[in-house]
A protein has these predicted regions:
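Radical SAM/AdoMet-radical enzyme domain recognition
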Residues: 82-83, 87, 91-97, 106-234
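N-terminal [4Fe-4S]-dependent radical SAM core
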Residues: 1-44, 88
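Conserved, mostly hydrophobic/aromatic
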Residues: 51, 97, 427
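Short loop/turn segments at strand-loop or loop-helix junctions that form parts
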Residues: 47-48, 59-61, 155-163, 233-236, ...
């Protein structure tokens, strides 16, 4: 075995991201966003492991539901982890408030955690199974005087037929049985927006196994019109509580899920023009719905689109377009254009192509007037089995590159991970697959002692 720098060493995950901006799997890859326009996503850990639904599979360790939900613990840990992210990764990133079920937090504690994330320059997204009521959402975003304490929220709601215990759908047999619950979730936000002006972003998550792969296409057709701005699919992996493993999840990979997604959309969904991290892990297609038809941001086979992409990443890659005040963003864009005035013509040419893909200017204007234009992103995240992550991660901690091809591929994917968790107590940034496959087991065992379900005395 040869020597290899472990990516948990200070600065190494960031270096891996920057390297991916130049190369991908051994060759130049101009489509790579990591290290050029994004540092990657961030997530919390050990902040509220408990969940009140039962999923098959579940990425949590067996001890997760034996840990008490404690708001003070959550807010303190979120604050420490986000501060460390800011120190190591810079002033801005997207971060997930994730653990067990976020709505088990009291609304005040949930809001406090989101506000702490924003204090550290993070754009937070709450990860939920969606089985909470409008009253909870109202208490989360509205302050004691009736105003909004949270002007904008982002939620990723997980719905699939592998989940057990949802009110009204305790043991769903098909994905179609969950469509009313998917619609109800969006409707809660629409109604509160109409009343308070709340802004929101909603994503739809779905685990895919051999049991429901054949229902992905129909689910896409049903969910796309509902009002979500993203549909994300996660092929199941053998990770977490092994008592909940029911199938051979290796039968379902990123290609199979993407093909089912395209069947549901009704045409090809091109993803090759923009890549986020390792293509074995992530596949993402950004676009918009125009009168219900999905239109991609880029055509990866059109040289004019690719030229616009390259200009954008070369000149605007360091500009944060979300989370920046409009006036400040305008100043930043104008500053870039002052140094690269030719970018304006390239951008106009790209916009012309995008409008043409959407059916022409008249159609786009008409759809905008009808309110039927909105962003829509499709993605698949393919996680890895704990049986591979465990030994691969252990070798990486010793600075050793695996000789076994499967373990070496696992090491490559861990080193290129776009989804990171912070350990300020040890000075490490850890890939999510390593967190859930290796570190969660001991972490939740310790939390079970720190936050037992029953408090005596």
């Amino acid at each position: 075995m040869g020597a290899a720098q472990p990516p948990s060493a200070p600065g190494d995950l960031a270096r891996a991201g920057r390297a991916l901006g130049r190369t991908a799997r051994g060759g130049a890859d101009a489509s790579q966003l990591l290290g050029r326009h994004a540092v990657g996503c961030e997530g919390t850990h050990g902040v509220f492991p408990k969940c009140n639904l039962t999923c098959t599979p579940c990425y949590h360790s067996a001890d997760a539901n034996k840990v008490r939900v404690d708001g003070q613990h959550t807010v303190a840990q979120v604050d420490a982890q986000m501060a460390y992210f800011r120190q190591r990764r810079g002033p801005y990133a997207h971060a997930q408030l994730i653990g067990g079920e976020v709505s088990l937090l009291a609304p005040d504690d949930h809001a406090a955690a989101l506000l702490r994330m924003r204090t550290h320059g993070r754009e937070p997204m709450s990860m939920t199974h969606g089985d909470f009521d409008a009253d909870y959402l109202r208490e989360l975003v509205v302050d004691g005087r009736g105003g909004l304490r949270l002007q904008r929220v982002s939620f990723a709601a997980h719905f699939d037929s592998l989940m057990r215990g949802r009110r009204g759908a305790v043991r769903p047999r098909t994905e179609a049985e969950l469509h009313p619950f998917r619609r109800r979730f969006v409707q809660m936000f629409r109604e509160l927006r109409a009343e308070t002006g709340l802004r929101y972003y909603l994503a739809h998550n779905m685990t895919v196994t051999p049991a429901n792969l054949g229902q992905v296409a129909e689910t896409v057709r049903a969910v796309v019109p509902m009002g979500y701005s993203m549909m994300s699919f996660q092929p199941a992996a053998h990770v977490g509580d092994d008592r909940r493993w029911r199938e051979d999840y290796r039968q379902v990979g990123i290609d199979e899920v993407w093909a089912a997604l395209e069947e549901g959309v009704g045409h090809r969904v091109p993803w090759e023009g923009l890549q986020f991290g390792d293509p074995r892990c992530n596949r993402t297609a950004w676009g918009a719905l125009v009168d219900g038809r999905w239109v991609p941001v880029l055509d990866p086979h059109d040289a004019r689109d690719l030229a616009a992409r390259d200009r954008f990443l070369d000149h605007f890659g360091g500009v944060a377009f979300t989370g920046t005040a409009p006036a400040l963003l305008l100043v930043k864009v104008l500053r870039v254009l002052r140094h690269h005035p030719g970018d304006a013509a390239v951008a106009l040419r790209w916009a012309t192509l995008a409008v043409r893909r959407a059916g022409g200017l008249r159609r786009v204007i008409g759809a905008a007037r009808r309110g039927t234009v909105r962003p829509m992103t499709f993605e698949v995240h393919s996680f890895m089995d704990a049986a591979q992550v465990g030994p691969a991660w252990e070798l990486m901690q010793r600075g050793v590159a695996a000789e076994d091809p499967e373990l070496r591929a696992t090491q490559e994917r861990l080193a290129a991970c776009t989804y990171t968790m912070a350990h300020p107590e040890t000075g490490r940034l850890v890939p999510a697959c390593a967190q859930h496959s290796v570190l969660d087991v001991e972490e939740n065992a310790q939390l079970r002692k720190l936050l037992p379900l029953t408090v005596l005395g």
